[in-house]
A protein has these predicted regions:
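Helical membrane-embedded segments and adjacent short helical loop/helix-boundary regions
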Residues: 2-16, 20-81, 87-98, 102
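Transmembrane alpha-helices that form the ion-translocation and gating core
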Residues: 97-135, 158-175
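Membrane-embedded alpha-helical segments of transport systems
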Residues: 105, 157-165, 189, 211-223
Length: 230
């Protein structure tokens, strides 16, 4: 197995896709949120690498090509937004106010918890962009002096938790309005949460896609201000 990773240019991509396929099959079979395809693919990939004694750099030689698709995939989320453009125009003020509140709440939460836990400045800024898409958040973390690799892990945890528990939270707080649900998913758990929003409905998916873009821009602007709080 180790030789396969060293000699094959696309070994990393192959393992990643097969792992995700396994996750998708388990999700369809058991229909439980815990069987999130991304979460399952991470676990399977790590297990294979550990058992095969393959280091990350060797794996990433082939897997890095998937990273190139990250930004184009994020841009494609504009399609459902375009399809719901009229709905957005009629609710523009409420949408923007809700997203602004969501971003500020996210940043304040990170600040308060970092203070309580006594985190360093580097740890604090590492988690500031936790709720925005990876394509934007990695740049924010690097610019502020955070640990980018840890930021990516925080993105994944935030997204998976939103994907798994987001719908349950909406039920608990009796959030039934499609626009509100979509904005909540997108602003709190970026693209991974948006995948769940798209499953729920077309309007939810479109609003979640909008939330990714707007929340990303607002976070880029406000995170520089919040970075000086610690």
């Amino acid at each position: 197995m180790h030789d396969f990773f060293e000699n094959s240019l696309f070994a990393g991509v192959t393992l990643s896709l097969i792992s995700y396929l396994i996750g998708s099959i388990l999700k369809k079979k058991f229909k439980l949120g815990i069987f999130n395809p991304l979460l399952i693919s991470i676990v399977v990939t790590i297990l294979v690498l550990v058992v095969s004694k393959v280091d990350y750099d060797t794996y990433n030689e082939g897997a890095k090509y998937l990273s190139w698709l990250l930004t184009p995939a994020t841009v494609c989320l504009a399609i459902p937004l375009y399809e719901q453009w009229e709905l957005l125009k009629h609710n523009c003020k409420a949408v923007m106010a809700g997203l602004a509140a969501g971003v500020v709440t996210s940043l304040c939460t990170v600040f308060v918890l970092s203070k309580i836990m006594g985190l360093t400045h580097e740890d604090y800024v590492t988690m500031l962009p936790k709720s925005i898409t990876t394509a934007i958040g990695m740049g924010v973390s690097e610019e502020l002096g955070g640990y980018v690799t840890i930021t990516v892990a925080v993105f994944i945890v935030t997204g998976v938790l939103g994907n798994i528990f987001g719908e349950l939270v909406c039920k608990i707080f009796r959030i039934t309005e499609p626009i509100s649900k979509g904005l909540a998913f997108g602003s709190a758990s970026h693209a991974i949460g948006t995948a769940k929003a798209i499953e729920i409905g077309e309007v939810e998916g479109a609003m979640s896609s909008l939330a990714i873009a707007v929340s990303g821009i607002l976070t880029v602007v406000l995170s520089s201000l919040f970075a000086h709080f610690m």
